[in-house]
Amino acid sequence: MIDLKQLRDDPDRVRESQRTRGEDPGLVDQLLQADQARREAISAADATRAEHKAYTKSMGKKMRDASPEEKENLRAKGTELSNVVKEKEEAQRVAEASVHDLQMQISNIVEGAPAGGEEDFVVVEKVGTPPQFDFEPKDHLELGESLGIIDMERGAKVSGSRFYFLKGAGALLQLGMLQLAAQKAVQHGFELMITPVIVNPESMSGTGFLGQHADEIYYLQEDNQYLVGTSEVALAGYHSKEIIDLSAGPKRYAGWSSCFRREAGSYGKDTRGILRVHQFDKVEMFSYCKPEDAAAEHQKLLSMEREMLAAVEVPYRIIDVAGGDLGSSAARKFDTEAWVPTQNTYRELTSTSNCTTFQARRLGIRYRDENNKTQIAATLNGTLATTRWLVAILENNQQADGSVKVPEALQPYVGQDVLKPVK
């Protein structure tokens, strides 16, 4: 959630951020009014409690010399004040709940992102040259089926649409890619974790995933829990309600998990193959740092994504995502998109987001500054490898005979340098 002090000090910036996102700037004024009402309710409750405390203290002396009738009046006055205290405290509770509800509706403040919507991104960099084939390239599913490594038909038979089996070298290719990502993360000082894939509502809400895109999440109604769409959720919740030590620099984790997404808003999109599926595997980086270090940490995560994409030998570009296409938690996000030959375009493989203090404020994650005062931490995340990378690896490394070259960095995991058709 956003910082109330920042909202009071610079409401125009928050309004502009809301407009940049295509969201309601009127929420800012509603929150300012609710915040003022909350502060007035707190003052009223404090004053009433003080009055009641003073009356209770003085009543003891008065009771010693009072007549029975006076004692009854004194007690009645005390009861009346006690009831007023309860009323004021309830008014304070309601006012605080109103502020909290409005805070939860306002997205993070955009920082440096281009204006506009989904198509208004800015290309930051292009790396590699899209391959020029002297044959008609096959898409990843046709390749996967001919190589005997992807089985969508049986995936649908067992689980429904957008499910699949990875077989043989396909399973090894994915596991090798994830293992390579895990090793690179560890080499760069990240602590590797295999995270839970079921989380509580506090963790899901705290990371900002129960807002506009809540319908994308699998909800386990009987248990009041959720399946994660990314290990970011579990890694963010890992230090919830804690004071963490950032004196030696950022605290970095890499989460390996299966991920689940309903793809509720994707009817008819990418129905062929494994580009958009309900279940996939991913290695996700997650950093906690001081707010002033967040921009530099964002670049570190992006550089690691560059390193992994270079290792799997696919042409890609980096885009600066426009404000109107940001998730509610992200102040800024860079996507890396790989070239997909049969679609003649770039498709997203990874993203890395700077969530500033938005998630940590919701989750109660703090650190101590140089003056030993507690401050809200910043959080960042970025994907280091995931299932959909297989799409780009297969298509960009295919050969005229239907075989696919295995990127050199993945050959030790797959045990082959070329995958050959089996049918």
Swiss-Prot record:
Q: Which GO terms describe its cellular component?
A: cytoplasm
Per UniProt, subcellular location reads as: Cytoplasm
Source organism superkingdom: Bacteria
Matches recorded under PROSITE patterns: AA_TRNA_LIGASE_II (PS50862)
Main location class: cytoplasm
**Residues that hold L-serine according to the record:** T230, S231, E232, E284, T383
**Single Gene Ontology MF annotation:** ATP binding
Residues reported in the UniProt entry to bind ATP: R261, R262, E263, V277, E348, L349, T350, S351
Q: Which HAMAP family match?
A: Ser_tRNA_synth_type1 (MF_00176)
The entry's family comment says: Belongs to the class-II aminoacyl-tRNA synthetase family. Type-1 seryl-tRNA synthetase subfamily.
Q: What does this protein do?
A: Catalyzes the attachment of serine to tRNA(Ser). Is also able to aminoacylate tRNA(Sec) with serine, to form the misacylated tRNA L-seryl-tRNA(Sec), which will be further converted into selenocysteinyl-tRNA(Sec).
The text the record gives for the protein's domains is: Consists of two distinct domains, a catalytic core and a N-terminal extension that is involved in tRNA binding.
Protein name listed in UniProt = Serine--tRNA ligase
Species of origin reads Corynebacterium kroppenstedtii (strain DSM 44385 / JCM 11950 / CIP 105744 / CCUG 35717)
| Gene that encodes the chain | serS
